[in-house]
Amino acid sequence: MKKRSYLSILVAGAMCAGLILSGCSSEGGKEPADSNSPAPQVSTSPESEYPDQAAADNVAALIDAIYVQQRTEDTDAQCTAAKEAWDALTDAQKELVSGEFADPDYFGRDTGDASLDDPRNQDDIGENELLVVSFGTSFNDSRVADIKSIEDALQAAYPDWSVRRAFTAQIIINHVQARDGEYIDNMDQALERAVANGVKNLVI
């Protein structure tokens, strides 16, 4: 009887010791907060972390938007926006421009003096028109030497006819317009111009 009571006391004591140790272990795992610990880092967006690249990417997106074959009612404004955004970049930012079609050469490459060209998009055509149609080129020197020289020769040979120009590549038209501020008609625009001017004899 005494032995059983002694055994019960030992078991009860062991259980109490286990509970005490368990409580100490769980409390000991919690460290007091350090008032001097740094505040958690706040994640930053790529735009705020890399502002130069963000500015360059914006220009690349604007260039890609006008590197298309379809002209819309927004094309003129898009061309202007792309050039203004490019002009606002630093030289270092311009080197970062890269898109599906965009690169620093789109605005940065020197292809000659665009002011030497004549887009031949004037009204007052008269009744007779020679419409010179080509794919076109955005290289200013080549456009002056090749396309313009042919148009000038035709105008000299046929003084009673008005020589006008149309490009079939809207991508090139947009490029020249955005970069140099030169407006060249596409085929639809050229034909609409002929109708608006009352042209009766049109040779393409």
Please give the residue ranges for each predicted region:
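Beta-rich interaction/scaffold domains
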Residues: 42-110
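Bacterial signal peptide processing site
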Residues: 25-28
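C-terminal motif of bacterial Sec signal peptides marking the signal peptidase cleavage site
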Residues: 20-23
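Bacterial N-terminal signal peptides that target proteins for export
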Residues: 2-10
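Intrinsically disordered, low-complexity proline-rich regions
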Residues: 31, 37-41, 45
